[in-house]
Amino acid sequence: MDRTLESLQLVIARVLPHRDPALVFKDLNVVAILQEFWESKQKKKAVLPSEGIIVYESLSSLGPPFVSYVTLPGGSCFGNFQSCLSRAEARRDAAKVALINSLFNELPCRRITKEFIMESVQEAVSSTSGNLKDADDPSTSIGAYHYMLESNIGKTMLEFQELMIVFQLLHWNGSLKALRETKCSRQEVISYYSQCSLDEKMRSHMALDWIMKEQESPGIISQELQVALRELEEVRKAGHELRFYKEKKEILSLALSQIYSDEVTTSSWDNQMSLALHGYR
């Protein structure tokens, strides 16, 4: 633990040279420090200003505990894990979680290397009772995972997670299974979706898929939404990256809103959402 803390302090000294590494996480202005950290990174990459924006979102609530999310450039998302008595406190706590993860992501051990790939594939084989020989066959799950890691050598784990989010959602949505049934190879699917960003168009398509599922199995969206909300809260309180769970919640909420928008008034829609979330609460 001491060695990790020392490594993080070295990262702070390199990226934020005018800050005292020992005081960064105690600074109440952690929101500004997080902004400064990412502005420093974006300048080195010479990206457009709009691509370096940090976005904060506070959940509407009549009283504490308050919840705040912060989305970093690239899409990684974190939330406050402490029980916060004010929106400002929740925002600071979310920023602190994001800053710790951002700094940790700069460590050499968080970069994809040949050694990292070998260890990850071996772990995947052990956890799935697979075969190490499958790593060279992109048509297998292990082979597809190996191919994706190889395609992203040199990237950090946060960058890799940002790519994986699309495939996680496609798997959850059932789209990957449907693509396999059309005889598309895993390699073709990976190559295509690696170039796709998770935008409003993709979310709308996924919401439409869930609307079709709802027609076949009434109530499935509400059930999935309850699960997604429970998972989101658990992951947030653990201080982990939570974009996958947040995207699931937003896609399912979008699907519900589209189903009822033409059938009920705004007040009835609010009642429907309350009923959908009743099991979660």
From Swiss-Prot:
Alphabetized InterPro entries for the sequence: Autophagy-related_EPG5 (IPR051436), LIX1 (IPR029270)
A biological-process GO annotation: autophagosome maturation
Any single Pfam family the record assigns to this protein: LIX1
GO CC term, one of those recorded: cytoplasm
Domain of life: Eukaryota
Recorded family membership: Belongs to the LIX1 family.
Record PANTHER family: ECTOPIC P GRANULES PROTEIN 5 HOMOLOG, PROTEIN LIMB EXPRESSION 1 HOMOLOG
Protein name per Swiss-Prot or TrEMBL: Protein limb expression 1
Organism: Gallus gallus (Chicken)
Gene that encodes the chain: LIX1
